[in-house]
Amino acid sequence: MAAKFLLTILVTFAAVASLGMADSVLLSGQTLYAGHSLTSGSYTLTIQNNCNLVKYQHGRQIWASDTDGQGSQCRLTLRSDGNLIIYDDNNMVVWGSDCWGNNGTYALVLQQDGLFVIYGPVLWPLGLNGCRSLNGEITVAKDSTEPQHEDIKMVINN
């Protein structure tokens, strides 16, 4: 079981490295600080100084976490349990994906199609169809063939 998980992680990171995706990936335990961004093609995901997480396409805002004004000098962190969190400068949670599981290796990827996806091990038992965020439902997709209608996806390894 552990060998299968390790192989999955190695394949995931080899793919990320070979595609030159360093600017579009945030790994578990890493932080994106206020004013910094992930970029993929025409899309940019920025954590702003006012704590708003915003996705842009060609410089035009197309999605936001609606957390502006809820703190200052915020940062976006992908925790080792898979939970994506915006913290303010007092380490208070401003926004979170509220999806987490066992500690593991996860990767937030801003894809070429503009979706930002969290890849990693299974976070919940079968039958649970989604996780709540602080501002709405996060669509969970088991694989890349399922319909994608939201901006955030949780992709799990079977």
UniProtKB/Swiss-Prot annotation:
Superkingdom in the source lineage: Eukaryota
Protein name: Curculin-2
Described purpose of this protein according to its UniProt entry: Taste-modifying protein; sweet-tasting. After curculin, water elicits a sweet taste, and sour substances induce a stronger sense of sweetness.
Signal sequence, start to end: 1-22
SMART domains the record matches: B_lectin (SM00108)
Propeptide: 136-158
UniProt entry keywords in alphabetical sequence: Disulfide bond, Glycoprotein, Lectin, Signal, Taste-modifying protein
GO molecular function annotation: carbohydrate binding
Residues covered by the Bulb-type lectin domain: 23-131
Disulfide bonds: C51-C74
Segments forming a coiled coil: none
Binding partners and assembly: Heterodimer with curculin-1; Disulfide-linked.
Any GO BP annotation: response to other organism
InterPro entries, per the entry: Bulb-type_lectin_dom, Bulb-type_lectin_dom_sf
Native organism: Molineria latifolia (Lumbah)
Glycosylation sites recorded in the entry for this protein: N103
